Swiss-Prot record:
The protein's name in its UniProt record: Mitochondrial pyruvate carrier 3
A UniProt-annotated Pfam family: MPC
Position of the signal peptide: none
Description of how the protein assembles with itself and partners: The functional 150 kDa pyruvate import complex is a heteromer of MPC1 and either MPC2 or MPC3.
Membrane-spanning parts: 23-39, 55-71, 78-94
InterPro entries named in the record: MPC
Subcellular localization: Mitochondrion; Mitochondrion inner membrane
Miscellaneous: Present with 6750 molecules/cell in log phase SD medium.
Family that this chain belongs to: Belongs to the mitochondrial pyruvate carrier (MPC) (TC 2.A.105) family.
The protein's role, per its UniProt record: Mediates the uptake of pyruvate into mitochondria.
Membrane topology: Multi-pass membrane protein
Superkingdom of origin organism: Eukaryota
Organism: Saccharomyces cerevisiae (strain ATCC 204508 / S288c) (Baker's yeast)
GO BP annotation list: mitochondrial pyruvate transmembrane transport
Length: 146
C-alpha cells in the first residue's frame, strides 16, 4: 500500500461517522473490557460467578446488538462487542445452570439461583435464623420498674 493510499484510508477512518473522534468508536472500544473480564471469569469457580450480573450483561448485549443495526450510522463495532458480550454472558449462565442441575436443583431453583444468587438451603437457613432470633427477642425483656 502506497503512502498516499494509506493516508487516504486513515483520513477516511479518522473523519468517519464512527471514527475515533466520536462516541460511536470509544464506547464500544472501552466496552471490550467487559468481554475480556468475562473471558477471564472462565477460570473462576462457577460458585463465584454472578448469575444476576451475567443475566444483565446478556440482556444488554441482546438489546444493544439489535440497536446497533437500527441506528444511523450502523455501528458494526458496537454490534460486535455486544455480540461477544452476549456470548460470554450466555456461556457463564450455561455454566451456572449446568452446575446447579448437577447438584440436584430443579429448573425453577436454577432460575431462582441465577436471579437471587441464593441456594434453597441458604434461603431456608436464613428463614430459620430469622425466626429463631425473633422468638428469642420478642417478649423476653423484663418490665422496667422505677
Amino acid at each position: 500500500m502506497s503512502a498516499s493510499a494509506f493516508n487516504f484510508a486513515f483520513r477516511r477512518f479518522w473523519n468517519s461517522e464512527t471514527g475515533p473522534k466520536t462516541v460511536h468508536f470509544w464506547a464500544p472500544t472501552l466496552k471490550w473490557g467487559l468481554v475480556f473480564a468475562g473471558l477471564n471469569d472462565i477460570k473462576r469457580p462457577v460458585e463465584k460467578v454472578s448469575g444476576a450480573q451475567n443475566l444483565s450483561l446478556l440482556a444488554t448485549a441482546l438489546i444493544w446488538t439489535r440497536w446497533s443495526f437500527v441506528i444511523k450510522p450502523k455501528n458494526y463495532l458496537l454490534a460486535s462487542v455486544n455480540f461477544f458480550l452476549g456470548c460470554t454472558a450466555g456461556y457463564h449462565l450455561t455454566r451456572i445452570a449446568n452446575f446447579r442441575i448437577r447438584n440436584g436443583d430443579s429448573f425453577k431453583q436454577v432460575i431462582h439461583y441465577i436471579i437471587k444468587g441464593e441456594t434453597p438451603a441458604a434461603v431456608a437457613a436464613k428463614q430459620t435464623a430469622s425466626t429463631s432470633m425473633n422468638k428469642g427477642v420478642i417478649g423476653t425483656n423484663p418490665p422496667i420498674t422505677h
